[in-house]
Amino acid sequence: MTFTAFTMFLVFSTFSQSMMVNRTGTITIMFTTMLFFLSMDIVAMSPGMTLFNNWFNLTPYNLPLSFLMLSLIVMLLMYSTSNHRYDLKSPFYLLLLLTNMMGLLLFPLVNDLIALYVVMELQSYSLYLLTGLHSRSYNSSRASLLYFLMGGVASTIMLLASYFVYALTGTTNLSDMAMFYSYSNAFDYFDILLVALLFKMGMAPLHRWSIAVYNYAPTYITAYISMVAKMSMVSWIFANANLFHHHVTILFFYISLAMAAYKPLFQVNIKTMLAYSGMLNFSYILLSMMSYDPAFYIYMIQYVLTHLILFLGMLGASQYVNSPISIWSPLTFMHQLKLPNLTLAFSLILALFSLIGMPPTPGFYAKLFVLSAALQDNYVLETCAIVVCSVVATYYYANMIKVLFNSSTQKVTNFINPSLAFTMASATSLLFSFFMFMPSLSEGLYLITL
């Protein structure tokens, strides 16, 4: 259905305004999400099924992640369905996003190394074009070129790993490789593939390029590429965690944890701080992957909710900036967070409290589940390290909260548009009432792991 929508809008975007294309496309993706939700039967799917000559594997483990990505895309697209003070309309935005969405939804299902590379490139090339969509911006073009160069290096490493695996096993299908696990060192080369994927995700120590890309790209493009692209890759890694050795994951875990806790202490750029915040969150996700626990799903949900509110809040706060740094990223520095809208400031403060891990926000429950699962699997040192680094990271979260607390209600002529306000209100309500759904959510995750 996504491919059909792409073909239709490829023609429709030529004869229509970008706003109409964005609105129609958002409705199409919402309808796709609804169909996906109504047809999803996780219990009946166990143990799973293969598609397209065993190239893709549909299991109860990757279905919830695909639905989560679809929901995130819908909520991010709501921003482009109405006019804003600093508008960046483009008729190609939705086409590139639909192309990227095909790669995103197929990536967690991949069961073959050839399909893995093809789907990765489908996802990556659309992201390169999305990043450089506004070519009048020098920073946007620079971000797109840097993203393309670093993504090309990671893709080369992926091909190298696939070559070594095929040379040893004689197959590229992951299901067929299961028989080689006990007496072959083919799975050592999957660690090279893991390094390539973590490189593409921007995990430390291979992270400097991603910080630059997120900083140079327009804010609403940064919101998309910093969340959705990482989610698809980490979903595939979690679904195929048995292919990788933990020593590589632990190495990236410790370095990412240290960098994400220390580096933002000296930052005043909000997008850079949120990029390091995402790295800290993915350190928790790496820990849950090592223990292979359903806490992974809970943490992914809270990560999506909190970062969605923060990025949409930045876009909403941009409406009140009278002296923008640029029209592509009006809100850039922390001192600009003094907002005349206390309700918006409250939503941002609530999301930051969730990142800190204050109860009863989702961040508290997600971190509790991840750390409990890690301790049960005897990851004691890793648990102590992540607690210490999270306490250090609290400083820069608290610094942002302090600036937001200085906000005051003022009479202004610029207002947030209704679609963005509705999305922010819905996400904030879900964030605030997350603890009410925890029993049902835990029960559902238990059924997945049976």
From Swiss-Prot:
Annotated GO MF terms: NADH dehydrogenase (ubiquinone) activity
Domain of life, source organism: Eukaryota
Membrane topology term: Multi-pass membrane protein
InterPro entries: ND/Mrp_TM (IPR001750)
Transmembrane segments: 25-45, 58-78, 90-110, 113-133, 145-165, 186-206, 219-239, 248-268, 272-292, 295-315, 344-364, 385-405, 414-436
GO CC aspect terms: mitochondrial inner membrane
Record-listed E.C. numbers: 7.1.1.2
Function in brief: Core subunit of the mitochondrial membrane respiratory chain NADH dehydrogenase (Complex I) that is believed to belong to the minimal assembly required for catalysis. Complex I functions in the transfer of electrons from NADH to the respiratory chain. The immediate electron acceptor for the enzyme is believed to be ubiquinone.
Protein name: NADH-ubiquinone oxidoreductase chain 2
Species in which this protein is naturally found: Debaryomyces hansenii (strain ATCC 36239 / CBS 767 / BCRC 21394 / JCM 1990 / NBRC 0083 / IGC 2968)
